[in-house]
Amino acid sequence: VTMVLEETLNKANMTMDEIDAIAVTYAPGLLGSLLVGVEFAKTLSFVYKKPLIAVNHIAGHIYANNLEKPMQFPLLALVVSGGHTDLILMKGDYEFEHIGGTLDDAIGECYDKVARVIGLGYPGGPKVEKAALEGEHTYDLPIPMNDDSFNMSFSGLKSSIINLVHNEKQRGNEVRNNDLARSFQDVAVDQLCRKTELAIKKY
């Protein structure tokens, strides 16, 4: 973590004396990573006598949009990352209402697993997307959560890819990776869009 901080300060051409405050993610996330980050931030805050600001990971994703233009309420945020797939309704500043999200795997997890199964490696997101651009939607995959709720599911889609690849290999058939990546991405992203559009219509 120290090396990352030093590299960041060097790239910004700044010193710790020029930093106004220290922000640190306290939740949600992997416990080990959070503990390391919080302890490091507390140490920096103590040593350099800087205010310490606790930040919610999901709120950080949402409020990062203020860097482009000020957010206007009410708003609907679709938060998508390796560990999260959530629909958050905000009627005002720091007013978060979780109205839907994945019931099992996050979409980022699903991308990583699919990339590994079809031999694209890690990280899955950019590799699956690149392969999908070269492919056609030729594989018939299940449409998850085809209902009126705002909830999503990606584990069934992931399992269907794993089973499809296994069965094709058992039969001695070639798996068309680009086509499978395209078919998967179309179904996965369609679910995000459908659920977001449903929420927009309601709220």
Model-predicted regions and their roles:
Residues 77, 85-89:
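Short beta-strand scaffold segments in enzyme catalytic cores
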Residues 92-134, 158-159, 163-167:
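Glycine-rich phosphate-binding loop plus the immediately following alpha-helix
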Residues 24, 52-57, 124:
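General beta-strand structural signal in soluble alpha/beta enzymes
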Residues 1-12, 191-195:
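Short, well-ordered amphipathic alpha-helical segments that serve as non-catalytic structural scaffolds
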Residues 6-42, 46:
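Short beta-strand-loop/turn "lid" adjacent to the catalytic site in phosphate-handling enzymes
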